[in-house]
Amino acid sequence: MSLAAPKSIKPKDWQSRGNPQNLLGHSIFVVDEGPANAPVILLLHGFPTSSWDWNLIWESLKKDYRLIALDMLGFGFSDKPNRRDYSIHQQADIVEALIKKYQLKEFHVLAHDYGDTVAQELLSRQIEENGAGYWLSCCFLNGGLFPETHRALLTQKL
């Protein structure tokens, strides 16, 4: 028995599946697919990529879940302001604005790499009871979970 590899789609085809949303004054690209009444998975991409990273698992997951993925500020099809420092706190603020705009009450979080760090900030807000929505679960993939041991690449520091 062999398993066929998932079929990848081209970034321009991925772009046609999403829409820009005005979040905190920025145009943020968002893909929202799957059954409207299904459990929600919020997907946070890594560095230096975009929501397109999720395309290989998208079709399989969207059969049973409503999937919402955004391109964070400065990435993918979202705004890339010049002369701008991108902070984890700002990215978390944008994700929370999305959660509020989409009126997400509860959801799962799937985060990768840079998205892990953003998710950690969001999780901290949850613990302090001032975060948006309610997390059902969280999965961190390949990120710097422990700041004291994380060694960012030179390109991540620039």
Q: Predicted segments — roles?
A:
Residues L56-Y65, K101:
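A short, Lys/Arg-enriched amphipathic alpha-helix followed by its capping loop at the start of a domain
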Residues F47-W58:
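The serine-hydrolase catalytic nucleophile loop
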Residues S2-P35, V40, P48, I68, ...:
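Flexible "cap/lid" subdomain of the alpha/beta-hydrolase fold that forms the substrate-access gate
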